[in-house]
């Protein structure tokens, strides 16, 4: 310990002497008319002397400050990794943009330099931008699975409440007046029949088991179903433990009140893609108008399960 103290003392004396000599030389150089290069050399030496002093100061830095410096360095490293990730994403977006440009290569924007044609140019620009926006939206909103959804509400599908579990009652989803709750605004069951898949826009039911009865837009022979949920990356809570896990699908005969036909049992894997399609294990012998979705478990949420979107695919009765 004594040896280290003497080293620090000697280093401090050396640095102080070095800086003093440098200061005297600097004053002497000012009073003489030496060439510019020796002065530049002195500046470099003085700068390195300052850096050496700072390094020695860091050696004498308290442990708390060293820990703080270490944490700041780790933060900078994390930020650097995030920047690298964003650069990779930019490359992906560039590739997508190229694909978009290829999709609209038939559209061209003429260059007008005549001031009289400015309005015409603006109109063309608006049209081109509109076409590009529509193309982009089609790219992003287009069904990745490319299968007709006969459980789509806008196409005529609906939920039969008599065959559906009760919604989860959440006190946070209630309006109050003078401390008295009078209106719930939780999402209805038919939320799962709509393509608006955003955090919070899901139908929740109590616990990990529940069911919903769906009247399809038309009679079909079901061949597959699709389950969709948000990813953990966009979840406000950072997890999707309320996502469905095991579920079964049944076809219901005779105007949604008759015999149930088992069509298959599946597992929605939250670690895989947010949109997962499952081919039915059993085929119905005739066209069906109603399908029952039975949730058997979720990914660990103790209070409720949340469904974002459920689709039903198949062959219309006109083609059977």
From Swiss-Prot:
Topology in the lipid bilayer is annotated as: Single-pass membrane protein
Subcellular location per the Swiss-Prot or TrEMBL entry: Membrane; Nucleus envelope; Nucleus inner membrane
| Keyword Nucleus annotated | yes
Which Gene3D superfamilies is this protein grouped with? Answer: Galactose-binding domain-like
Q: Enumerate the Nuclear topological stretches.
A: 1-6
Q: What does this protein do?
A: As a probable component of the LINC (LInker of Nucleoskeleton and Cytoskeleton) complex, involved in the connection between the nuclear lamina and the cytoskeleton. The nucleocytoplasmic interactions established by the LINC complex play an important role in the transmission of mechanical forces across the nuclear envelope and in nuclear movement and positioning. May be involved in nuclear remodeling during sperm head formation in spermatogenesis. A probable SUN3:SYNE1 LINC complex may tether spermatid nuclei to posterior cytoskeletal structures such as the manchette.
What subunit structure does UniProt give?
Self-associates. Interacts with SYNE1 and SPAG4/SUN4. Proposed to form a spermatogenesis-specific LINC complex with SYNE1 during sperm head formation possibly implicating a SUN domain-based heterotrimer with SPAG4/SUN4 associating with SYNE1. Can interact with SYNE3; the interaction is questioned by missing colocalization in spermatids.
Kindly provide the name given to this protein in its UniProt entry.
Answer: SUN domain-containing protein 3
The scientific name of the source species is: Mus musculus (Mouse)
């Amino acid at each position: 310990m004594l040896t280290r103290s003497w080293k620090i003392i000697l280093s401090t004396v050396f640095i102080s002497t070095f800086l003093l000599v440098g200061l005297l030389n600097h004053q002497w150089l000012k009073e003489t008319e030496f060439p510019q290069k020796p002065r530049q050399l002195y500046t470099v030496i003085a700068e390195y002397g300052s850096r050496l002093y700072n390094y020695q100061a860091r050696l004498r830095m308290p442990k708390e400050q060293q820990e703080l410096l270490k944490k700041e360095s780790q933060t900078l490293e994390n930020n650097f990794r995030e920047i690298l990730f964003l650069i990779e994403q930019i490359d992906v977006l560039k590739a997508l943009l190229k694909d978009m440009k290829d999709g609209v290569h038939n559209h061209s924007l003429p260059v007008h330099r005549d001031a009289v044609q400015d309005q015409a140019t603006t109109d063309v620009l608006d049209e081109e931008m509109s076409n590009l926006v529509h193309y982009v939206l089609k790219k992003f909103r287009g069904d990745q699975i490319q299968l007709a959804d006969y459980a789509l509400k806008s196409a005529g599908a609906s939920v039969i409440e008599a065959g559906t579990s009760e919604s989860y009652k959440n006190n946070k989803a209630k309006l109050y007046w003078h401390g008295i709750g009078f209106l719930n605004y939780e999402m209805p069951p038919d939320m799962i029949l709509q393509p608006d898949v955003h955090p919070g826009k899901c139908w929740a039911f109590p616990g990990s088991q529940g069911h919903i009865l769906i009247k399809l837009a038309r009679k079909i022979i079901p061949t597959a179903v699709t389950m969709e949920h948000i990813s953990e990356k966009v979840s406000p809570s950072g997890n999707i433990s309320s996502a469905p896990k095991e579920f079964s699908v049944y076809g219901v005969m005779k105007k949604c009140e008759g015999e149930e036909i088992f069509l298959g049992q599946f597992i929605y894997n939250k670690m895989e893609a947010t949109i997962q399609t499952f081919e039915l294990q059993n085929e119905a012998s005739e066209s069906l108008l109603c399908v029952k979705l039975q949730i058997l478990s979720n990914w660990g949420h103790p209070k409720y399960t949340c469904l974002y979107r459920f689709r039903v695919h198949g062959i219309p009765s006109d083609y059977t």
